[in-house]
Regions:
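Conserved, single-site charged/polar hotspot
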Residues: 8, 32, 52, 64, ...
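Hydrophobic beta-strand segments
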Residues: 33-40, 86
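Beta-strand-rich domain onsets/edges
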Residues: 1-30, 45, 51
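Short, acidic Ser/Thr/Gly-rich low-complexity loop/linker segments typical of extracellular
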Residues: 42-72
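Beta-strand-rich interaction surfaces with strong enrichment in secreted/lumenal proteins
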Residues: 7, 48-51, 73-76, 99-102
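A short, solvent-exposed loop/turn motif at the edges and junctions
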Residues: 71-99
Length: 228
């Protein structure tokens, strides 16, 4: 894949974006936060929009330039989405810089940003969030092979008698045998949404989106039920 194409391709179509800003501690909305959006695929990386959040912690929905719709519907095309950086700041919170937000044509992207409260000092802190290129566009290492039949260990925990949709999914941020990697608790709904956003494009036909999300849910629930 030739990533140099991204700096030269045209942006004839339009997608939309709304940013929601919350406190990481209690998920309360943060009003009057400043949101700056920059296009990463132009030479000057100029500011595309500067917005403020309302009393609900939301910006207005804005229009942003994107590549042609056909790119996301045709395999092996140029980058099918516009890449934007989002910087969010608010008094009393660390500034958050999100790099690589992906905006597709003809669909609305909703980006949640959770700001970290400052520790009570005047020190200026920031946190960086990098979004990797989409799995359908970039090249990634193949999935680690797994044994078709696995040994079931006696953990002493209760074994589910039927498939249950969990409230949270535990995400292991590392290789399966890396005990030093951290685990994160993610709500089931957010986990499915995040996986779907990484595996398919929102511009696909509705039937294709349904089929892929059902496959993602089936795989996830199988992992939970079998404790793999």
């Amino acid at each position: 894949m030739d990533f140099s194409l991204t700096n030269n391709q045209s942006f004839p179509d339009i997608g939309t974006l709304q940013v929601n800003v919350f406190s990481q501690n209690n998920y309360n909305p943060i009003p009057n936060a400043t949101v700056i959006i920059q296009n990463t695929q132009t030479q000057e990386s100029s500011v595309a929009e500067q917005l403020d959040t309302d009393s609900s912690g939301q910006t207005e929905t804005i229009s942003l330039k994107t590549p042609p719709l056909e790119y996301s519907l045709t395999p092996e095309s140029s980058m099918p989405y516009g890449e934007y950086n989002i910087t969010v700041s608010a008094p009393g919170y660390e500034t958050t810089i999100l790099t690589g937000a992906q905006i597709l044509p003809d669909v609305k992207a909703i980006q949640d940003i959770r700001l970290v409260p400052l520790p009570g000092t005047e020190e200026t802190l920031s946190q960086d969030i990098d979004i990797d290129p989409h799995t359908l566009y970039a090249e990634y290492p193949p999935k680690i092979p797994e044994a078709e039949i696995k040994t079931v260990a006696d953990t002493g925990e209760i074994i589910l008698s039927q498939v249950v949709i969990p409230e949270y999914i535990i995400v292991h941020d590392g290789l399966p045998d890396d005990n030093t990697a951290p685990n994160y608790y993610v709500t089931y709904k957010d986990y499915i949404k995040n996986v779907a956003c990484s595996e398919i494009y929102a511009t696909w036909p509705e039937s294709s989106i349904y089929a892929n999300i059902l496959a993602i849910m089936s795989f996830t629930l199988n992992r939970v039920y079998t404790e793999w």
